[in-house]
């Protein structure tokens, strides 16, 4: 096959959409929509800029270099690049995100029917990771199995939920609260940033590229083109889901005004609108959303570590699936306390890496720009990580006084200054001298 047919390309886009749509993507927008109230659309637009825009730019950046994070990190050197990639894959994979998909889907989709006991959780997670392992053992079939089978079911459930939210709202749009009253666009922008979907996009790039190549596409330009199209399809789907869920939250103050999170808002809405069957609908949405995300994460880790280490893809995915199963049943709380600071610390590095890569044609010497700017991002990533670990006493007060520091964006101004200085030096120094043989 030299080109993807329209249906195959759509299935690729559906697969990409399903990889990104985790439980958190469904849970958060309703709570943000409820807080935004009459400013719901301004907040939703700000949320889309970062919650959808940043992951889409990441997919584009990865597509331009062939799908692998290793190519993106070349300007900072092999050792630093490999260290960064390992940290991202482990933190977003078996140490945190993958086990969490199983626990969240159990607590939201199954526990209401079975209870929260250890035995139901064990039975569920064994079945859950068995399905995950079945799907990931043959990554070349992901488009067929996820894009053509699982995602249409997920989309159908989302259409029912989203359609009901729009055409059968629980009430009128409520009033805004908190910071959404004065700056809804900015608040939505910041909350979209805090979803950290950019880290997921970094690891999913290789899954998308591999799925395309496994369809017989060998032309690198076509791989890039199809990856970008898949990213656009996924971004469109995510945007529609987010908008519907924002509206659901904004119109649910009458039935869930005291809700503490999106789970309670969604539960209140589906039970009022659909009755007992609403809980089943929500269970299907959450379980399939978590399942497809877990499949993407395990597949990405398998592709990366089998290429990095002298072990087979099959061995990696089996080991990571078993490890995730164990963590989901007994070690999640402790690993979350360790992994969340790592994720927060890696996020500035990931965003800076993507931004510099997208504008790589502007740099005379990429390493002269990448290295100093990434070092500054690393410094402030460590600061944010310490803050997430509740170790603020280790951080000098000056960091807390930076603009947007309370929103985990204290790194933005220093990194911008470092970028300007690096670009000026890059232009002044000119082209690097070529080595003489």
Curated annotation (Swiss-Prot):
Keywords: Amino-acid transport, Cell inner membrane, Cell membrane, Membrane, Transmembrane, Transmembrane helix, Transport. One of its GO terms (cellular component) is plasma membrane. GO terms for molecular function: L-isoleucine transmembrane transporter activity; L-leucine transmembrane transporter activity; L-valine transmembrane transporter activity. It is found in: Cell inner membrane. InterPro entries: Brnchd-chn_aa_trnsp_Livcs. It comes from the Bacteria. The keyword Transport applies. It is a multi-pass membrane protein. The chain crosses the membrane at residues 9-29, 43-63, 80-100, 117-137, 149-169, 192-212, 228-248, 280-300, 308-328, 335-355, 369-389, 404-424. GO terms for biological process: branched-chain amino acid transport; isoleucine transport; L-leucine transport; valine transport. Pfam families: Branch_AA_trans. Belongs to the branched chain amino acid transporter family. Component of the LIV-II transport system for branched-chain amino acids. BraB is specific for isoleucine, leucine and valine. The LIV-II transport system is coupled to sodium and lithium ions. This is Branched-chain amino acid transport system 2 carrier protein. It comes from Pseudomonas aeruginosa (strain ATCC 15692 / DSM 22644 / CIP 104116 / JCM 14847 / LMG 12228 / 1C / PRS 101 / PAO1). The gene is braB.
């Amino acid at each position: 096959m030299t080109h993807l047919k329209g249906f195959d390309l759509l299935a690729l886009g559906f697969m990409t959409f399903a990889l990104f749509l985790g439980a958190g993507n469904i849970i958060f927008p309703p709570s943000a929509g409820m807080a935004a109230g009459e400013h719901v659309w301004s907040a939703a637009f700000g949320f889309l800029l970062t919650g959808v825009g940043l992951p889409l730019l990441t997919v584009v950046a990865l597509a331009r270099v062939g799908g692998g994070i290793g190519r993106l990190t070349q300007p900072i050197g092999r050792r630093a690049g490999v260290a960064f990639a390992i940290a991202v894959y482990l933190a977003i994979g078996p140490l945190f995100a993958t086990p969490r998909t199983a626990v969240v889907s159990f607590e939201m989709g199954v526990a209401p029917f079975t209870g929260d006991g250890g035995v139901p959780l064990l039975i569920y997670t064994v079945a859950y990771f068995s399905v995950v392992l079945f799907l990931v053992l043959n990554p070349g079939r992901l488009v067929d199995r996820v894009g053509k089978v699982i995602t249409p079911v997920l989309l159908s459930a989302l259409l029912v939920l989203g359609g009901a939210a729009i055409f059968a709202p629980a009430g009128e749009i409520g009033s805004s609260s908190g910071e959404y009253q004065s700056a809804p666009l900015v608040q939505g922008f910041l909350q979209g940033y805090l979803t950290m979907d950019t880290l997921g996009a970094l690891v999913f790039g290789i899954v998308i590229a591999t799925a395309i190549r496994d369809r017989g596409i060998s032309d690198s330009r076509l791989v890039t083109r199809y990856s970008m199209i898949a990213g656009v399809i996924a971004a469109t789907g995510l945007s529609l889901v987010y908008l519907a869920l924002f509206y659901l939250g904004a119109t649910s103050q009458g039935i869930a005004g005291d809700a503490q999170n999106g789970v309670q808002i969604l539960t209140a809405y589906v039970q009022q609108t659909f009755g007992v069957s609403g809980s089943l609908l929500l269970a299907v949405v959450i379980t399939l959303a978590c399942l497809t995300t877990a499949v993407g994460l395990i597949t990405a880790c398998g592709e990366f570590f089998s290429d990095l280490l002298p072990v087979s893809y099959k061995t990696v995915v089996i080991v990571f699936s078993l490890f995730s199963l164990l963590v989901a049943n007994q070690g999640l709380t402790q690993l979350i306390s360790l992994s969340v600071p790592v994720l927060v610390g890696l996020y500035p590095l990931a965003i800076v890496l993507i931004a510099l890569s997208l504008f790589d044609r502007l740099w005379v010497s990429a390493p002269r720009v990448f290295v100093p700017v990434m070092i500054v991002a690393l410094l402030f990533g460590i600061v944010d990580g310490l803050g997430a670990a509740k170790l603020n006493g280790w951080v000098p007060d000056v960091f807390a006084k930076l603009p947007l520091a309370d929103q985990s964006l204290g790194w933005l101004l220093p990194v911008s200054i470092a970028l300007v200085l690096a670009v000026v030096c890059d232009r002044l120094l000119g082209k690097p001298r070529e080595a003489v043989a």
